[in-house]
């Protein structure tokens, strides 16, 4: 876990990291990210045009808190209730392809590695610490 991650508001941290990720041109979103739903429980695609960067920032925050995450964990974490009509709602996970794509982007950027205990590399940790310091001010 990175020091100070709990001392900043998650919304402000995610917003600052999202703007940083958008400014670097290293992120390659999914091909149909503008029209695809994020999970089986969703009825429509996200309204925000930059939802992929928001999800990516949120996943980086989860990695910095938990240490290591999998695409199955991310699918469960970002899932939702599916409206099944008159039957009771049922919790379904998000599409794991989104989490896999984000993890692949972070690997290509050099922010994470495959180590099971600590996924963030030194480059990723320094960027997250810089964002935390920027949000604290």
UniProtKB/Swiss-Prot annotation:
Domain of life where this protein originates: Eukaryota
User: Where's it found, cell-wise?
Assistant: Cytoplasm
What protein does this entry describe? Answer: Small ribosomal subunit protein eS19
- SMART domains annotated for this entry? Ribosomal_S19e
> Which Pfam family, any one of them, does this sequence belong to?
Ribosomal_S19e
Key word Kinase present in the record? no
Q: Which GO terms describe its molecular function?
A: RNA binding; structural constituent of ribosome
Q: Does the record carry Transcription regulation as a key word?
A: no
Which keywords appear in this protein's UniProt record, sorted alphabetically?
Answer: Cytoplasm, Ribonucleoprotein, Ribosomal protein
What species is given as this protein's source?
Answer: Encephalitozoon cuniculi (strain GB-M1)
Instruction: Give the GO cellular component terms, alphabetically.
Output: cytosolic small ribosomal subunit
Q: How does it assemble?
A: Component of the small ribosomal subunit.
């Amino acid at each position: 876990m990175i020091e100070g991650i709990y001392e900043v508001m998650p919304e402000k941290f995610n917003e600052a990291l999202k703007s940083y990720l958008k400014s670097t041109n290293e992120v390659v979103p999914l091909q149909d990210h503008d029209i695809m739903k994020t999970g089986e429980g969703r009825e429509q695609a996200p309204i925000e045009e930059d939802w992929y960067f928001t999800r990516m920032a949120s996943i980086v925050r989860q990695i910095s808190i938990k240490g290591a995450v999998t695409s199955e964990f991310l699918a469960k974490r970002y899932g939702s209730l599916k409206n099944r009509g008159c039957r009771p709602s049922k919790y379904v996970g998000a599409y794991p392809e989104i989490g896999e794509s984000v993890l692949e982007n972070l690997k290509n950027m050099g922010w994470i590695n495959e180590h099971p205990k600590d996924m963030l590399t030194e480059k990723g940790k320094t960027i997250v610490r810089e964002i935390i310091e920027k949000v604290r001010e």
